[in-house]
Amino acid sequence: MLKHMQPKYIQMVRICRLLGSVALFALAAYATPPVSCSQGARQYFPCELTFEMQPDELKSPQSAVNDDLLRVEFRGPSHTTYMMRGFWDGGRTLRIRFTPTEAGEWAYRITSASKRLNEQEAKFTASETAEAGMVNVANLRHWRSTNKKPHLWLGAEAPWLDLDQPAFETWLDARKKNGFTHIRGTILSGHGNNKPFAADGQPDLAYFQALDKRILAVADRSFTADLIIADQAFVESGAFKDREKMEPLLRYVVARYGGLNVTWQGIEHFDDMAGSRGLLRDMGLFLKQLDGFRHPRSSDARASSSPLMGDGWMNYIVEASPRPEVAAVEHQFTEMPSVHVVSTAEPAGFRHELWNATTNGQYLSVPYEALRNDANAKAVETWYKLVSDARHWEYEPFFDVSGARAVAVDGRKDPNAEVDFVECLTYAQSPGIVEVTLPRHKYNPYWVNPSTGEEIPLKDIRTEVISRQTPDNISDWVLYLPREGRKESMARSYYFESITPPVQEPEVDVAKTPFDVVDPPGEQLSLQTPVPFKIKLTKNNRATRAMQYVWWGEVISSGEGLRLLAIGPAGFLSVPKALASPGGILTLRLEAINANGKAYEIDRVYTLTP
């Protein structure tokens, strides 16, 4: 059996280069690491193995970062294996960080450049806990945990290093009370004087040990950490300018944090930067190789990360447009879970984004500034109370409604049987009459005030058409229509997924499309001035009474992929700088859905002119 030394952190003399706030990082340098895997490991909580290398085994810090010196393969009670890489933590110390996904006996085997350590084997026992485990994609557009139970993704953005540790932990506890399940933040920041890596690629341990303290506090409270790998400033510093520079930095980040319950979110606002698609493709494919747990992968975006889907590395979408049409249309063209990043802190706008995203079938991530307003925290608690009690993992947009947006759950086991709705959630952003058409069953409806959480029960309903005036003419309202008995029955006997989620092929036949592109006219688009765009309906009927349009553009020769150009039936659009190549050929793609959710796609080709 291999004997391990007790974990100990080594003081770094480079603090003077790093610190803008000395006290914060000095405290973090002494952060207590997770328990030793050999002494006190717990299911779904991180533990560590610590190795002290000999002088001839670790010749320089650069070698510790650039060379793959240590790997450990863990094998659980059910014989599932995970490969974890070691990370340098100062001096001659290497650590392996790991989260046991099962209770019981684990075995591990070491692969190392050190002959002294290579092929050593040992065992440890992880005690059972009641936690849910790591998050992964399920039911096509939804989530579940390692314990195979539905997972409700509700994220809050964290300023990792802007708060001292006590204040940060107090903030975390408040988020737990609100109902949040994820904490979101950036790993590699290029802002300020506190840089994660020196020019030679050596990690600044004070930076990472401070970050450890925050992220481990997140793990201790059973949150999932949503990790934006790098902000724009870090990317623009040139640290990722080529694969040779990027790989050791990414390897270090994954070794340090990939053993925790995390998701990966690429780079900040990728769609603002030229060259970001190629960078993310390299990062994403490298993540697939490095990440032993195969955590969910996507990228942060100003609009949406959906244009990156075709590159084969991501498995969920991050969408951040304040306009609900983007995600509404996107849902009908994609087959991945989508997380909406709320863009405003103003209470009314905040609620609108919260509930519009929900009725688009999305999950949520909330900015730090928004939660500094108690009204928004209350709105989140109201949202969580209602949605956590619903079958949210089967929500799909529902269109047989007027005066509101809606999602519903179809409880059929057999897709060829008659529709059997279990519940319907509608959101009226503006007061007025909400009308919903549902199969004839007994529903137990009630109104919910999304600002206060006030619930107003209504009489049970058996009619097919349900029409109700909102309780006041001032604010937004949620009308929830569950069949409580049916929900209870399904909870006892149904599998995680009761029916295969719907997927449709967009209509591309112009003859069957109820609209046409009037503008931009001609075959050229100017790069100097905004260009008008306009849709003309060619068929006016009930299905076209509420069309939603999203305009994308791509210059194939640029390699940048699609970029969002405009939203709506008319207005002006500009070509983003990443696509602005005079003489380039731009493919203008219009994606749309009608009032019934039917999807349409039209492509036009233009030459870009100076």
Language-model segment annotations:
Residues 82-140:
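Extended acidic/polar, glycine-enriched regions
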Residues 541-550:
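Solvent-exposed loop segments of extracellular immunoglobulin-like
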Residues 67-69, 129-324:
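Active-site mouth of glycoside hydrolases
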Residues 554-575:
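Surface-exposed, flexible coil segments in extracellular/virion-facing regions
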